[in-house]
């Protein structure tokens, strides 16, 4: 995407209610190919340098330490690490006093959906996060979120188990992030092969997650999701206790 077009899209999303803009130069969806560090920097930095870093929070979505360091120097506020808590990325977050998003995944993007397998999906993901807890506490990061990684080495059954039980990942050490928007689990459940036609499923999962205590919802359709969550929260509120 042209840097100017990417900046325009980011500004549009912020105006619609997005509080965090997640910026990434490399696709990590299942089946995607690896790109070089140099290419990722070439894609990301021109966009980041044009974004107003004082108007919203910017998250750099990367698995590469050098990319994260340059992005944080250019004004990004968070590292979104889909690799599962790289020690070097955690150290970079500590060095730059940045927030961190720790995502669970099973396998590499190219092959993660070939044969994902768990004995107990929710328990194993929870144990994965717990194993990182002491290291994270020692670093003293300003903010931390965990992301169970919907679609990253998971079948439809795994994804549904995670979303039904996402409240079990809540912890005083971190908040929880859910990225379920437009993903293939909606197609597998509702026969919606076109990602753009998955708005209903995306919003339903967002409303459910917020009701269960999830702090961050990663979405594509900002205005629709913001409106839906606002209405759902209002309907769930006892007017006598407002």
Name every feature range the model reports, one short phrase each.
Residues 149-151:
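Short strand-loop junctions, especially beta-strand C-caps/beta-turns
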Residues 1-9, 28-50, 54-57, 65-66, ...:
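Active-site-adjacent loop and "lid" segments of alpha/beta metabolic enzymes
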Residues 8-24, 212-213:
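Catalytic domains of carbohydrate-active enzymes, especially glycoside hydrolases
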């Amino acid at each position: 995407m042209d840097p100017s077009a990417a900046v325009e899209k980011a500004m549009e999303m912020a105006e619609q209610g997005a509080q965090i803009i997640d910026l990434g130069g490399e696709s990590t969806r299942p089946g995607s190919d690896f790109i070089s560090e140099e290419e990722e920097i070439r894609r990301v930095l021109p966009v980041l340098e044009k974004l107003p870093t004082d108007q919203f929070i910017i998250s750099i979505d990367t698995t590469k330490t050098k990319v994260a360091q340059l992005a944080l120097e250019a004004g990004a506020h968070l590292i979104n690490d889909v690799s599962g808590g790289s020690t070097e990325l955690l150290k970079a977050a500590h060095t730059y006093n940045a927030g961190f998003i720790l995502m669970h995944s099973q396998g590499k993007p190219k092959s993660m959906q070939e044969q994902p397998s768990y004995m107990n999906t929710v328990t194993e993901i929870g144990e994965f996060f717990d194993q990182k807890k002491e290291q994270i506490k020692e670093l003293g990061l300003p903010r931390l979120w965990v992301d169970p990684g919907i679609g990253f080495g998971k079948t439809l059954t795994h994804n549904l188990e995670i979303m039904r039980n996402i409240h079990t990942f809540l912890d005083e050490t971190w908040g929880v992030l859910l990225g379920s928007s437009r993903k293939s689990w909606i197609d597998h459940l509702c026969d919606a092969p076109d990602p753009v036609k998955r708005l209903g499923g995306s919003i339903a999962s967002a409303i459910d997650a917020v009701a269960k205590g999830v702090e961050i919802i990663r979405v594509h359709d900002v205005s629709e999701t913001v409106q839906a969550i606002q209405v759902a929260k209002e309907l769930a509120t006892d007017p006598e206790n407002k």
